[in-house]
């Protein structure tokens, strides 16, 4: 069985966010780098750096948390994997779902690379729906 790297990074970020960890280390692949760049651009994570250890590359993510808060606070409310290895979900650009009326983002894998739902609608292309973030 193969590994689902997208599900692994989503789970790692979600678990670190619930545990209020500041730093997460995930394996670096082309897909994970593209998804993390989208999360960085959209403001869900604070910083990314590439780290090499024993000829393997890792991405070290710094999550964005509010400091000095008495009550529990989570920045990333929810991440959900949609298309998975056993059930691929595709959509054309007109039927890409809007998450929370446009407040959340949908990450798609298109013929022009991995992009958000807004970018795909602007370019008029659809693709495989990888995950929802809201």
Curated annotation (Swiss-Prot):
Keywords of this entry: Chloroplast, Plastid, Ribonucleoprotein, Ribosomal protein, RNA-binding, rRNA-binding
Top-level taxon of origin: Eukaryota
GO molecular function, one term: structural constituent of ribosome
Record's keyword annotation contains Ribosomal protein: yes
Subunit structure: Part of the 30S ribosomal subunit.
Function: One of the primary rRNA binding proteins, it binds directly to 16S rRNA central domain where it helps coordinate assembly of the platform of the 30S subunit.
Protein name per UniProt: Small ribosomal subunit protein uS8c
Organism: Solanum bulbocastanum
Primary gene name: rps8
């Amino acid at each position: 069985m193969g590994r689902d790297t997208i599900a692994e990074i989503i789970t790692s970020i979600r678990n670190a966010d619930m545990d209020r960890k500041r730093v997460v280390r995930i394996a670096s692949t082309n897909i994970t780098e593209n998804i993390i760049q989208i999360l960085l651009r959209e403001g869900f994570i604070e910083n990314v750096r590439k780290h090499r250890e024993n000829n393997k590359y890792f991405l070290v993510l710094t999550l964005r948390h509010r400091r000095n808060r008495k009550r529990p606070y989570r920045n990333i409310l929810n991440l959900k994997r949609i298309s998975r290895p056993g059930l691929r979900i595709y959509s054309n650009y007109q039927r890409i779902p809007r998450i929370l009326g446009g407040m959340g983002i949908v990450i798609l894998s298109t013929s022009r690379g991995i992009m958000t739902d807004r970018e795909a609608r602007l370019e008029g292309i659809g693709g495989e729906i990888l995950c929802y973030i809201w």
